[in-house]
Amino acid sequence: MRFNHFSIVDKNFDEQLAELDQLGFRWSVFWDEKKILKDFLIQSPTDMTVLQANTELDVIEFLKSSIELDWEIFWNITLQLLDFVPNFDFEIGKATEFAKKLNLPQRDVEMTTETIISAFYYLLCSRRKSGMILVEHWVSEGLLPLDNHYHFFNDKSLATFDSSLLEREVVWVESPVDTEQKGKNDLIKIQIIRPKSTEKLPVVITASPYHLGINEKANDLALHEMNVDLEKKDSHKIHVQGKLPQKRPSETKELPIVDKAPYRFTHGWTYSLNDYFLTRGFASIYVAGVGTRGSNGFQTSGDYQQIYSMTAVIDWLNGRTRAYTSRKKTHEIKATWANGKVAMTGKSYLGTMAYGAATTGVDGLEVILAEAGISSWYNYYRENGLVRSPGGFPGEDLDVLAALTYSRNLDGADYLKGNDEYEKRLAEMTTALDRKSGDYNQFWHDRNYLINSDQVRADVLIVHGLQDWNVTPEQAYNFWQALPEGHAKHAFLHRGAHIYMNSWQSIDFSETINAYFSAKLLDRDLNLNLPPVILQENSKEQVWSAVSKFGGDDQLKLPLGKTAVSFAQFDNHYDDESFKKYSKDFNVFKKDLFENKANEAVIDLELPSELTINGPIELEIRLKLNDSKGLLSAQILDFGPKKRLEDKARVKDFKVLDRGRNFMLDDLVELPLVESPYQLVTKGFTNLQNKDLLTVSDLKADEWFTLKFELQPTIYHLEKADKLRVILYSTDFEHTVRDNRKVTYEIDLSQSKLIIPIESVKK
């Protein structure tokens, strides 16, 4: 077990004394060390009679004895406060060594009154075995009263807002869009959860088109057939133009203003990180946007009309637009309780909305926490001129997602009045997204947030899994690279798949975000010394490192051929039995592919030295095929048996994370380190007619040509003599159309190479 503390803010001694005093630890520098220890235990919500001090004495006996307090006894006692069991988790008498292995904050200094006070200060900032830092655990146990006012320790807001007194309101915000072209602004239903307090509250918004319901039956009926041939395309240039939808002015009709919303709600999905912030004085707002249950409009899926329906909430919180107590618009309601400062959170589609909102530059949005978000929808459903399904969802496309999230149809009255128009607009979307060619076009350009990255004013916090093949790492990498130089940005890059990371044992993620949000949303100084990239190492359990950048400056070129003349070939076609088997379950195909049992060319490369891949590997391939259309797929494995992190978190302890005071208890989880035969490092796909994003070229059969394309970016450490397995093939049964024509591909390995971006990791 190893803790990684990124939330701890260094404080001078006077600041430490003042903050300890506010918690009730009022000590004099003239007290001796044992008296400070005794008072610390008396004031804390813990039973010191159960604590062991050394191999012979419990704490009560030790405090009565003449034995001096030293660092070994200090750690014997305090490790128990951090939930570690003496004689089982650690050996009494070797506690200092154990604390060092845990990576707990400690200094090798002489014990004095001042150094022990500092030690207790940083102990309160330290992570417990069960996943909370000590001060937050003790506050949840009653160290401070629930007075519905802000209290801070080490620059983090504490859970002193009463979760039993939460206001739950529903209002309808007027958006600046008319997605159905009815001549009136779409109204957007939002759900507000806020502490009852006289304080002006900041808001954490989660914009989730899933939030008010999904239509799974409509989704399943809309899925596209994958067992189709690849289309041949005529050569041409693609032209797009940057344009944003026109914003409609707010209505000006005067209405009576009320200060209480009549509509309430009792239950619904909430993000546990938002729950954590609720009890620390941050209101939560959930908004699903246009085309969702209780709102107006069509589900435009990813364009700026949808984004504007989300940012309208920020406008309302800052008095720039109106909200109503019902869809009838008879009474207006104002956010008099809000301070106007907003953060956005959420994973996947939710993180996507945060990216999009940030690129509007909306005033009041101070910071986004975009977790596994999409920065360009083309790169989610397409790749290099190729229809490419997100991992795990073959046949899905943006019109399918629209059918899933157009939840207005779940209400019968809305279905009666709006389904015909919805069906018409959905058909228009299906045509516009152009599955036939797979090319970039104006439809996708309108859903590309990267082109407006220069408008971002909010601080950007990115979370992304480097084993996420649903929303691939390029979505985070491209947004990171697109931000103007010097923009405030940080990335948490973990080894998981498409998962949240706010309840992991190894890292104080929630507390780090607390320090950041407390500064940005409550007008406090941001003293957090956060590195640009916080990286989970790929070959060690519970180890996180600080990295200076996402994308290396140097390159390593590895030739694919081992001799001057070296060729490989593979066929595209499968027999009927294999084709049906792989089409039925793409996981069977993946297993065979990784074990060299599919139609593929396999090249094993032993590394000449230790290296860290940092960024997208570029594949330069010399090839020919006996057809005038084709696709190329590539995957690279870290191949060979060794211990690696799994991509899904396992529960280490159930319901031990208290998000407030006995509020929304959460499981403690972690990625386990397990023996495995290989691990996927990166992959990529391309249509051979698309040499670049905006150019479609003719492909001549039986003629050699050179192709370059980038694979998914990663940061991945490899030791000398580790083996990279490069797999080249055509049809991928998880991602691409299942083209089963009889085509043979030939690769000139002697003229092909990997171009690997490398960057050493800062330790």
Swiss-Prot record:
Protein name (record): Xaa-Pro dipeptidyl-peptidase
Keyword terms, alphabetized: Aminopeptidase, Cytoplasm, Hydrolase, Protease, Serine protease
Native source species: Lactococcus lactis subsp. lactis (strain IL1403)
Biological role: Removes N-terminal dipeptides sequentially from polypeptides having unsubstituted N-termini provided that the penultimate residue is proline.
Assembly and interaction partners: Homodimer.
Record flagged with keyword Lyase: no
Pfam families reported in the protein's UniProt record: Peptidase_S15, PepX_C, PepX_N
GO cellular-component term (any): cytoplasm
